[in-house]
Amino acid sequence: MSDAGGGKKPPVEPQAGPGPGRAAGERGLSGSFPLVLKKLMENPPRETRLDKEKGKEKLEEDESAAASTMAVSASLMPPIWDKTIPYDGESFHLEYMDLDEFLLENGIPASPTHLAQNLLLPVAELEGKESASSSTASPPSSSTAIFQPSETVSSTESSLEKERETPSPIDPSCVEVDVNFNPDPADLVLSSVPGGELFNPRKHRFAEEDLKPQPMIKKAKKVFVPDEQKDEKYWTRRKKNNVAAKRSRDARRLKENQITIRAAFLEKENTALRTEVAELRKEVGKCKTIVSKYETKYGPL
């Protein structure tokens, strides 16, 4: 055909449309890609296989070493935290772990009842151990002991309170002072009751009434009795009065002797206590000087 100018038009090339040949080529490429990926996964390259095998061997060696160390210290509970997995970027693999196998491998009982049965000892064994050893050890409990600082603080406070408590008063009669006192045996005999125990000036205590001054008894006026009136009744009365007077004189002399010997012992004891107190005061003075020097050098206590 020719246009209005009389020239010829150039031939138009046909455009490639979605024909059957192009669609078949694209379908072949998409179908071959999964096959290649599958072959690569089934048969990986040699380098990656060697790296995986090295990582597995290293992991097995670490597990065997940890198992040997745990077998040695099985009685002390194996330190699970010391068992590490090497990580070098490529040989780290997450695997499925069974809890029962993990507990069995580390020597930990699976059930808590089994744990309590293993920890508690039989009664016969405990009694045998207590009789054999002087120090009795308490059986281990299944629960772990928790440290509580409040208990220690309360125990220290109670001990300090016990130390600060004033001691109970001491009976002076129970205190014995080492005094060099050796009285005359004759004086001891005169100070003792006839037929009784020997007088002990170290332990004898007088009542307050005994130490009070005795009242003066006025003597009765003498009555002159002629010889004609001195009958048996007179002489019996006279003998009774003489016996009573002798008894009172003996009791008074006995008490006087006892008081004298007791006073001599107390004087000796007093001098011994005074010397002891003087020595204690000297020692306290030395301690005070030491404390004052310490305070001047290091500050108050």
From Swiss-Prot:
Induction: Accumulates according to a robust circadian rhythm in liver and kidney. In liver nuclei, the amplitude of daily oscillation has been estimated to be 9-fold. Expressed at nearly constant level in the brain. SMART domains: BRLZ. Residues 131-158 have a biased composition (Low complexity). Isoform Alpha and isoform Beta are expressed at high levels in lung, bladder, kidney, gut and brain. Residues 254-261 are annotated as: Leucine-zipper. GO terms for cellular component: nucleus. Residues 233-253 are annotated as: Basic motif. Residues 231-294 form the bZIP domain. The modification Phosphoserine is found at S30. SUPFAM superfamilies: Leucine zipper domain. GO terms for biological process: positive regulation of transcription by RNA polymerase II; rhythmic process. Binds DNA as a homodimer or a heterodimer. Can form a heterodimer with DBP. Transcription factor that binds to and transactivates the TSHB promoter. Binds to a minimal DNA-binding sequence 5'-[TC][AG][AG]TTA[TC][AG]-3'. Also activates the telokin promoter in smooth muscle-specific and calcium-dependent manner. This is Thyrotroph embryonic factor. The gene is Tef.
